[in-house]
Amino acid sequence: MLKWAIILAIVALIAGALGFSGLAGAAAGVAKILFFLFLVGFVLVLLLGGTVFKAATGPK
């Protein structure tokens, strides 16, 4: 999925440079959605990873 976000961002840049506003807008919109999905997933992994790591090491 990250590969598609990068591809769509590149397509949006190329289409924007060539003036295809409809295609650039659509590709940029999808890239933004995928970016925020990955951002939320990253934060969740950080939070859950911290709690799982603390539980695995036990109390001090």
Swiss-Prot record:
Q: What is this protein called?
A: UPF0391 membrane protein CCNA_00709
- Disulfide pairs here are none
The residues that cross the membrane are 4-24, 33-53
Species for this entry = Caulobacter vibrioides (strain NA1000 / CB15N) (Caulobacter crescentus)
Signal peptide bounds: none
Per UniProt, what is the membrane topology? Answer: Multi-pass membrane protein
Lineage, top-rank taxon, reads: Bacteria
Q: Can you list the GO cellular component terms from the UniProt entry? A: plasma membrane
* HAMAP family referenced in this protein's UniProt entry, alphabetically: UPF0391
Keywords tagged on the record: Cell membrane, Membrane, Transmembrane, Transmembrane helix
Cell compartments where the protein resides = Cell membrane
Question: What lineage does UniProt assign to this protein's organism?
Answer: Bacteria, Pseudomonadati, Pseudomonadota, Alphaproteobacteria, Caulobacterales
Q: Which family does it belong to?
A: Belongs to the UPF0391 family.
Extract the InterPro entries matched here: DUF1328
